[in-house]
Amino acid sequence: MGTEAEQPSPPSPPAQQQEQTNPPLWNAQNQKPARLYRLVLFFIAGSLAAWTIHALSNSNLVWKLRQLHHLPTAHYLQTRDEFAVYSVEELNAFKEIYDKSVSDSVGASYTKDEQTSINEALVSLRMAQDMYLAGKDDKASRLFEHALALAPRHPEVLLRYGEFLEHSQRNIVLADQYYFQALTISPSNSEALANRQRTADVVQTLDERRLQSLDSKRDALSAIHESNGALRRAKKEAYFQHIYHSVGIEGNTMTLAQTRSILETRMAVDGKSIDEHNEILGMDLAMKYINASLVQKIDITIKDILELHRRVLGHVDPIEGGEFRRNQVYVGGHVPPGPGDLALLMQRFERWLNSEHSSTLHPVNYAALAHYKLVHIHPFIDGNGRTSRLLMNTLLMRAGYPPVIIPKQQRNKYYHFLKLANEGDIRPFVRFIADCTEKTLDLYLWATSDLPQQIPMLIQTESEAGERLAQMQSPNVAQRSSILEFYESGSGALP
């Protein structure tokens, strides 16, 4: 019987080949630690990358939030309205970090000097309340003002001073402003919230009444025929006044007489810089452009604003005139948007200017908001204030109002109200523009009346003009009486 033959075994590979086929034991054992090291390094690198992206994202939000600190998102502040320069979607994206920043700022520690001022302010506040309860309102008022000067952003000081103004001084408008500021700083302050809920509707009604009274004066001025000699003289004088005060707000030292001389004769004034001359000539060019073109236009475009600015800086800086800035700028405590955001923000501003919603606003409110929006964006390297005031007056003129004169004597108030708008409350700035509008209307109505007195704006002595303007800053007795009767009635309805 045959058997299956055994297969010969394959020849053994050479020793060198066998070493390559079967690597040393120590190399195979070290593959697992090496693989583990790579995984750990990959995990660490991924974690660092994720943390870096998160940090950059948060830092970007914080940087943008610093620009948005004046745009409160809490509904009870009642200021999420047409003045915001960012969209609702963008504000919602910042809400979480905004709330965190508010809580952080409320609990922030103070420096030694700041804490000393706050302690002194609180002592003054307690003394003021004692004086008020004792019926010594004058002393109480001075102590409240001292406390506010020491701690202008302390919620308790703002709240108690507001209550004093509301109940003792019957100044509900200013009281409501302080309640608002207290809420902006401390959104959870229940007393400030309750006070504001009580005063908000009354103040809104008072503001509406004020705007209606401006319409009545505007209509009275419109009834005067253009051929009226006194009206023509008043317009000419107001033209000089407008340019003089607008450049004066920015620091121009020309007197009213010198400004008039430059505009009428085109002759240089001794002892004054070329730039000061050119600022006046630039305003003259811009005013003529408005009268010849913009007043008749239905819509105001970015190109129109650039053309306006080009004339404002045409003699001072023709290279930058009519061009958006290319650098970051800083205006006091306000940090305007970066140059990379200007194109988008100006496009939104243009849409808002010509929107159907804006057309429903009162002309003074609309013009003041446009002024604030543009000066907040701060699109130019220089001339933002002058251009914003010119745009404001363009919108007012289209609604039948004369160009508003903001007196240079009111420069500090003007900037103060812009600062309050940056902090969240646009209403004081709108009221300030309404005050200036009323004074300008009074200028024309007084000039065209049969009254023998000169009006404050037309007095040739500038010190007299400033003194008379200061007197007009406060409402007269009849106006105060009307406001008090309305508020004390408690009805909240117009009489």
Swiss-Prot record:
The active site is at H378. Residues 1-27 are annotated as: Disordered. Its EC number is 2.7.7.108, 3.1.4.-. TPR repeats lie at residues 121-154, 155-189. GO terms for molecular function: AMPylase activity; ATP binding; Hsp70 protein binding; protein adenylylhydrolase activity; protein homodimerization activity. One of its GO terms (cellular component) is plasma membrane. Keywords: ATP-binding, Hydrolase, Membrane, Nucleotide-binding, Nucleotidyltransferase, Repeat, TPR repeat, Transferase, Transmembrane, Transmembrane helix. It catalyses: L-tyrosyl-[protein] + ATP = O-(5'-adenylyl)-L-tyrosyl-[protein] + diphosphate; L-threonyl-[protein] + ATP = 3-O-(5'-adenylyl)-L-threonyl-[protein] + diphosphate; 3-O-(5'-adenylyl)-L-threonyl-[protein] + H2O = L-threonyl-[protein] + AMP + H(+). It is a single-pass membrane protein. Belongs to the fic family. Homodimer. Protein that can both mediate the addition of adenosine 5'-monophosphate (AMP) to specific residues of target proteins (AMPylation), and the removal of the same modification from target proteins (de-AMPylation), depending on the context. The side chain of Glu-250 determines which of the two opposing activities (AMPylase or de-AMPylase) will take place. Acts as a key regulator of the unfolded protein response (UPR) by mediating AMPylation or de-AMPylation of Hsc70-3/BiP. This is Protein adenylyltransferase Fic. It comes from Drosophila yakuba (Fruit fly).
